[in-house]
Amino acid sequence: LQEAGIPYDPDLVVWFHTEDRRSKPSMMVKEMVKTGSLPHGIVCYNDQIAVQVIESLEDCGLQVPKDISVTGYDNSLYAQRGTGITTIAHPQERLGEMAAELILEKINGVSEEDSRVERLIQPELIVRGSCRRLK
């Protein structure tokens, strides 16, 4: 956000517990539509939540991406539904390798300071049909 010159507004972040994942996203979408406080886009913490958000928006008579953009995260099979959800793919195989390397270091008594395991991953933006460019 900062790099794009967009100020962070904590009031625009919807927090919920995992056990609320079936009801809270839909409830919040309906509340935003009802109050007219719909943003240009909604960023979801995974693709499954993005599907729920899109379905809730469609239930409210809105079209994605014509009326609002939605993104997910994790490039799961959910992201490939319909016209597809724009998402962030993370290198799952590399994450597994890193986890194994960290476990081996722990077993061998390597301290956190002496660790040679890189902890930075390169995500990939996959643009699909759930987002549009703002004019």
Question: PLM features: residue spans?
Answer:
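Bacterial carbohydrate/catabolite-sensing allosteric modules
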Residues: L1-K135
